Amino acid sequence: MAKNDNAHSLRMVESLKQTVGNDRANEFEEKYPLSKSADIEKKFEWAKAACDYLEENFDAELIYKIRKECRCNDGKSIANKILKYLNKANSIEEFVASFNAKESFAKLEYISDNKILFCYPECYCACVKRVPQQLSRAWCYCTLGNAEGIFAE
């Protein structure tokens, strides 16, 4: 069996275990291994195959749950940065405007007092960011886990 030690693949396998069980996770891991030494083309091919697998085997809600758990970090550093803007602002609207004026890695959109839209302007994922092709939207759902981690702080 090929080596499966890439962090992206390990997170996907763990998420599959938690969401749909060991059998499906093991099936995925055996069929789609990814080594941490994989080059950018191999990583992109793996990400595309992962999206195809998810879309062929699960409904949209389950794909959302699986990918959401594949986030790359806990969001603490971004949460701390956002908190600095929030603590200096007199209102949510001011917080959003100040953040957007000074930061470019993400954008905020004020919806209401209890809702803010958080958006990355591009994909920062090491599996896909340097390949000039696009993936299914399923790949992007990990950002929901990132945003959840950021705002949980």
Kindly give the residue locations of the regions a language model identified.
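Active-site helix/loop of acyl-thioester processing domains in fatty-acid/polyketide metabolism
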Residues: R137-A152
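N-terminal accessory segment detector
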Residues: M1-L135
